[in-house]
């Protein structure tokens, strides 16, 4: 795992370009404290910060081919690199290192722009082709590894993290204020835009090509659900179990020790179980709180005992939680008000003290139907199939039922992700200082639903999550919180082979109206004790709602909600009324309050210069 940066600027001075690209790389040094390197010529410059995991002695970057016509920088891991290396050697390529980076270099020589579709792994890389004057970038199938870009005239900047652009003189730092309403509703932007004007994320499974000042994006893979019928749940459980086991084994590849995150849920327990087959005493890590009702430590301890693995526990206090948030917003690049990022930050810090790589369970819910949202979609679909007269009668009988109210809307408007923080745009807009006249979040999501009109509703919602929620929330949080501590986090569920099994599953084996991850739990039951295979989903529960009612943290948050940043963007009177109602127990406004608080902290870091001094 590493950090990559670079830019194109035809006619540049190579010496000056090296200084700039080195400065960009220094801003993401947390991604790679083990080494650095840079390259520059009259058109392009590439930089790299290295976290050495495979071939520590020989994998330095930027890496050039034999005649110096190709230069590559790479962040991630290629799990089938040995297979590809052997294939390339058969075609006459010679290798000077044992690294997966060199496989990318020779793979590009051999296959060109078809290279990404041959890769199994998590990756973001850039290849500068001096002969053709072409910069070619690619991002992995799921968006596990980040890559953002910014274009101004003929100059293109790219980096693992947006903050690297701050060191380039062509970058104009401006808030993309038009998208603030979308962000407030969803906690993220569902498309490629960011909260920095002109900065975009390269979408998952896409390539970017720069040549002569022009940028072209292309999709190289498009995962689709294609259910296979006529197989039993037992047969599916066997196939999925085998795919997950093989993926976990592939994700072990490293020249350093690999650990596991263990929460006690089925996802992390299954990954840990597979790890113990080759590494019986795998180091495991969990996080929790002194407030036991919110802590997953008891469940993690029980899982560790059942699996026979050592467990390192981390406890987060309210003081820790609030004190770390400013640094967390710096590492995230864009504000993220998901409270789960904070315990993850501390969990990664604890793990890095013992190991350099961890396996984690992200992606299982999205692939195998684990979220309540998917079960709600089952019921919404059933509601739509009822006779209209029955629906009218039920709606009249239960006028306040949210399911019935949403069920009357078109599919693309029913998505709970579009109104995750605020149930309606009207409720959201009363806190904003100006009228943005923006499309609703549901309208932003409509193109994704339009692309999968032929799928049943739960499957369509899953697919939209793959394109939006997974890369823009779940994986961004996992990447940034782990890289903040120079820890490589790998996600075995998000693998090509596991995906092949997941997208062939009939919907009834993913989720029903009452149960999620049906087939995955059946697969886990073949390997885990029943209490682990059937463990309820917990996520990262946080006692934040309780803390916001304590005088110390109430006062801290109120100060932010009435400060100069809040005054610029929000109705501070409405914010304080919301905070007071929460404190009095009249409502649980934790999610809304934390969203406003995180935006303000993030804005202070990136736009008023309040960067934590110890970063």
Question: What residue spans do the PLM features occupy?
Answer:
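Short aromatic-enriched loop/helix-cap "lid" or pocket-rim segments at secondary-structure transitions
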Residues: 297-298, 324-326, 369-374, 547
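Active-site adenylate/phosphate-handling loop in enzymes that bind or generate adenylated species
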Residues: 141, 346-404, 469, 474, ...
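Short secondary-structure boundary/capping segments
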Residues: 329-330, 372-379, 612-614
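Cysteine-centered catalytic environments shared across enzyme families
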Residues: 1-332, 344, 348, 526, ...
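Acceptor-substrate binding/catalytic loop of class I
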Residues: 334-338
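Short catalytic/ligand-binding loop motif for oxyanion handling, primarily in non-cytosolic enzymes
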Residues: 134-136, 145-146, 166, 366-370, ...
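Adenosyl-5′-phosphate
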Residues: 1, 167, 197-204, 214, ...
